[in-house]
Amino acid sequence: MKLVLQRVKEASVSIDGKIAGAINQGLLLLVGVGPDDNAEDLAYAVRKIVNMRIFSDADGKMNQSIQDIKGSILSVSQFTLYADTKKGNRPAFTGAAKPDLARQLYDSFNEQLAEFVPVERGVFGADMQVSLINDGPVTIILDTKCH
């Protein structure tokens, strides 16, 4: 899995002008699923995300997790994280998981996250508009195959 984590003051995702999910303080996750991803990748990503200390404590140090601040997650599927830009000027997305597998793993990932923190989400495969107010900004890339 490839994920982009953005610390936000608020974020929302809309489809056809209607809000599908919205959060206040927390994390916006852009979630890409690869063809070789499995339950181990999901568990690793969930563990890292819910425990990563990227929120400020009383002294202004990044020392608190999303659980510590009682934040929420907005999860948005994003197959374009697997873009291959090596040849030409048009990205290829053949490195992303096929839709059936990606949807299954994305849904399972969100269910596992929801065991720890509230999770809002976009609609898998939909054309979405994402709005956010970055906090920091703090943006972190997490690749489950690089640990």
Swiss-Prot record:
Its EC number is 3.1.1.96. It catalyses: glycyl-tRNA(Ala) + H2O = tRNA(Ala) + glycine + H(+); a D-aminoacyl-tRNA + H2O = a tRNA + a D-alpha-amino acid + H(+). Keywords: Cytoplasm, Hydrolase, RNA-binding, tRNA-binding. GO terms for biological process: D-amino acid catabolic process. GO terms for cellular component: cytoplasm. The keyword tRNA processing does not apply. It is found in: Cytoplasm. Pfam families: Tyr_Deacylase. GO terms for molecular function: D-tyrosyl-tRNA(Tyr) deacylase activity; Gly-tRNA(Ala) deacylase activity; Ser(Gly)-tRNA(Ala) hydrolase activity; tRNA binding. The keyword Kinase does not apply. It comes from the Bacteria. It is an enzyme of class 3 (hydrolase). InterPro entries: Daa-tRNA_deacyls_DTD (IPR003732), DTD-like_sf (IPR023509). A motif (Gly-cisPro motif, important for rejection of L-amino acids) lies at residues 136-137. Its main location: cytoplasm. CDD domains: Dtyr_deacylase. Homodimer. An aminoacyl-tRNA editing enzyme that deacylates mischarged D-aminoacyl-tRNAs. Also deacylates mischarged glycyl-tRNA(Ala), protecting cells against glycine mischarging by AlaRS. Acts via tRNA-based rather than protein-based catalysis; rejects L-amino acids rather than detecting D-amino acids in the active site. By recycling D-aminoacyl-tRNA to D-amino acids and free tRNA molecules, this enzyme counteracts the toxicity associated with the formation of D-aminoacyl-tRNA entities in vivo and helps enforce protein L-homochirality. HAMAP family: Deacylase_Dtd (MF_00518). Belongs to the DTD family. A Gly-cisPro motif from one monomer fits into the active site of the other monomer to allow specific chiral rejection of L-amino acids. This is D-aminoacyl-tRNA deacylase. It comes from Streptococcus pyogenes serotype M49 (strain NZ131). The lineage of its organism: Bacteria, Bacillati, Bacillota, Bacilli, Lactobacillales. The gene is dtd.
